[in-house]
Amino acid sequence: MAHPLTRRKFNALTVALSSVWLASSLGLVVTANVAQAQAPKGPEFKLIKPDQTPDVEKGKIEVIEFFWFGCPHCNGLEPSVREWKKKLAPDVVFKRVHVPFREEKHQQLFYTLESMGKVEDMVDKVFYAMHVEHNPLDNNKKMVEWATKQGLDAKLFEQTLESFGVKTKMKKASNLAAAHQVDGVPALTVNGKFYTAPSMAGSNGHALRLVDQFVEQERKAKK
């Protein structure tokens, strides 16, 4: 089974980010317990200690995906996340947090797109550029050229890229990742309490099923 990307492992990545996440060989079987509200006991997840306070309205449940654009595992998870999001209940707030591992320019790109209100429209296109077209998007010139090809206002994009607001978002994201004890990506957290990842759960699908289970547990705890 592929292992999560860590700071130490990032240096081993090549510029052509074309790795493919190997299918899990653990032979994990999803049982009816996954649908129950009681959290499982085992290495498929860990508890975040101390708990982190969710940044959502009262009564809402926060789910965070910690990721990096350059990560092939995150690219592999994206289609599953896209389908999973379509079924989210109104009380679940899904957030993406881009970690600062290895390439801060990618974090800067994400928060520039977010500040422009374009992140959901562009996430798939960024992954495609990096992992299919092998465009590293690792400096301002490449990012501005890419943004222009996507129909974004080049001047506004460049101004936003170097804005104080984006730098503030980057710092907040980095602090959030540290507080949630993120040491590899992709990683998924629920309400600042539960932490799982495809590498821990055995597959993308099982990781998301665990997230659903933790969401249900938090929902019942609020009643």
Residue ranges with predicted function:
Residues 38-48, 135, 140-141, 210:
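Periplasmic c-type cytochrome electron-transfer domains
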Residues 2-103, 216-223:
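Extracytoplasmic thiol/disulfide redox context detector
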Residues 5, 9, 149-223:
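C-terminal cap of thioredoxin/glutaredoxin-like
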Residues 78-85, 106-110, 123, 140, ...:
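Extracytoplasmic/secreted envelope proteins and their assembly/folding machinery
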Residues 87-116, 120-147:
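Structural microenvironment flanking redox-active thiols in thiol-disulfide oxidoreductases
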Residues 70-73, 100-104, 128-133, 163-166, ...:
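Solvent-exposed loop/turn segments at secondary-structure junctions
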Residues 67-70, 81, 85-88, 113-117, ...:
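Sec/Tat-exported extracytoplasmic proteins
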